[in-house]
């Protein structure tokens, strides 16, 4: 199998740089298209950053491959759940509790705090049910579901592959 000849460090570097690249693309779209991210969007952004750093840690410390791939998979599963919930909110906006109009949950409190500390990166000003941007008929939340599923599959492959630093 040709993939097994690629060093594990390269796989982790791809994961890390890919996730950080997704954050950069999201920031560019937000700025250029004047999009207003919601608390769930910002939390997904935070998860992409965390997975990116886990990938870079795997690049620097490839001996911890099992730990790094498990962390990436766990964060990916969490991201998948958040993105799927936002996708549901966008599909059924009449049934969805809108972010910001109820008592804040742990995610909203974290996002609010991050937004005060680094507003250009983490300030949530949008609504979770809005579909302001679409590509090929899929909203950004829909794309995040697919991307997080891919990250989980990628992390599982990193976990089960033969060790080759």
Swiss-Prot record:
It comes from the Bacteria. Keywords: Cell inner membrane, Cell membrane, Chaperone, Disulfide bond, Electron transport, Membrane, Oxidoreductase, Redox-active center, Transmembrane, Transmembrane helix, Transport. Residues 29-46, 85-142 are periplasmic. It is found in: Cell inner membrane. One of its GO terms (molecular function) is protein-disulfide reductase activity. Disulfide bonds join 38-41, 99-128. Its main location: membrane. GO terms for biological process: protein folding. The chain crosses the membrane at residues 12-28, 47-61, 67-84, 143-161. Required for disulfide bond formation in some periplasmic proteins. Acts by oxidizing the DsbA protein. This is Disulfide bond formation protein B.
């Amino acid at each position: 199998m040709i993939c097994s000849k690629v060093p594990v460090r390269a796989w982790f570097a791809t994961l890390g740089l890919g996730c950080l690249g997704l954050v950069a693309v999201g920031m560019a779209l937000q700025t250029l298209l004047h999009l207003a991210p919601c608390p769930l969007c910002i939390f997904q952004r935070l998860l992409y950053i965390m997975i990116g750093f886990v990938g870079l840690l795997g690049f620097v410390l490839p001996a911890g491959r099992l730990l790094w791939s498990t962390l990436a998979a766990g964060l990916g599963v969490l991201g998948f759940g958040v993105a799927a919930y936002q996708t549901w909110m966008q599909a059924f906006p009449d049934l969805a509790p809108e972010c910001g109009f109820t008592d804040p949950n742990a995610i909203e409190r974290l996002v609010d705090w991050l937004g005060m500390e680094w507003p250009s990166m983490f300030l949530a000003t949008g609504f979770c049910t809005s579909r302001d941007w679409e590509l090929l008929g899929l909203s950004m939340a829909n794309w995040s579901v697919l991307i997080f599923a891919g990250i989980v599959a990628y992390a599982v492959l990193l976990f089960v592959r033969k060790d080759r630093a």
